[in-house]
């Protein structure tokens, strides 16, 4: 089901490494489609610090669209930035997927203080014609 994350330093470089910068505040972007959920954590300037998706968390096929997969993906993305000292974050949620609420609940449980949660799902003002409805 879900992949286990290898422990830090299990296979690392010997010598100088790029220093990890402290990030007290950041922005968490959740893109929840019907097929997958992608969680990206950036600093306030928009540089990507960490990201994860249901696919990279070990889920394949239709399981990627489930709320549990979104919860796991959010946990993987958040774990890396909590180690870098992130305490506060803004959350931007985009898309109609099932993983919206599950990812948000996982972020709330991580201990990061959420300053605000904003829904940034693009809504057309009668733009392009939508695809035809499925007939199953």
Curated annotation (Swiss-Prot):
Domain of life (superkingdom): Eukaryota
Disulfide linkage: none
GO cellular component terms, A-Z: chloroplast; ribonucleoprotein complex; ribosome
Keyword RNA-binding recorded: yes
Keywords annotated in UniProt: Chloroplast, Plastid, Ribonucleoprotein, Ribosomal protein, RNA-binding, rRNA-binding
GO biological process terms, semicolon-separated: translation
Pfam families tied to this protein: Ribosomal_S11
Cell location: Plastid, Chloroplast
Gene3D superfamilies: Ribosomal protein S11
Region (Disordered): 1-22
Subunit description: Part of the 30S ribosomal subunit.
Cited NCBIfam families: PRK05309.1 (NF003698), uS11_bact (TIGR03632)
Name the record gives this protein: Small ribosomal subunit protein uS11c
Organism for this UniProt entry: Lactuca sativa (Garden lettuce)
Name of encoding gene: rps11
């Amino acid at each position: 089901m879900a992949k286990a994350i290898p422990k830090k330093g299990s296979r690392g470089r010997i010598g100088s490494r790029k220093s990890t910068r402290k990030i007290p505040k950041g922005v968490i972007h959740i893109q929840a489609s019907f097929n997958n959920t992608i969680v990206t954590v950036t600093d306030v300037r928009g540089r990507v610090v960490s990201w994860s998706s249901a696919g990279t968390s070990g889920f394949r096929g239709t399981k990627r669209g489930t709320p549990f997969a979104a919860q796991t993906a959010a946990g993987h993305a958040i774990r890396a930035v909590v180690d870098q000292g992130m305490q506060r974050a803004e959350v931007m949620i985009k898309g109609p997927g099932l993983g919206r609420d599950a990812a948000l609940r996982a972020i709330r449980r991580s201990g990061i203080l959420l300053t605000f949660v904003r829904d940034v799902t693009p809504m057309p003002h009668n733009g392009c014609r939508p695809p035809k409805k499925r007939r199953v």
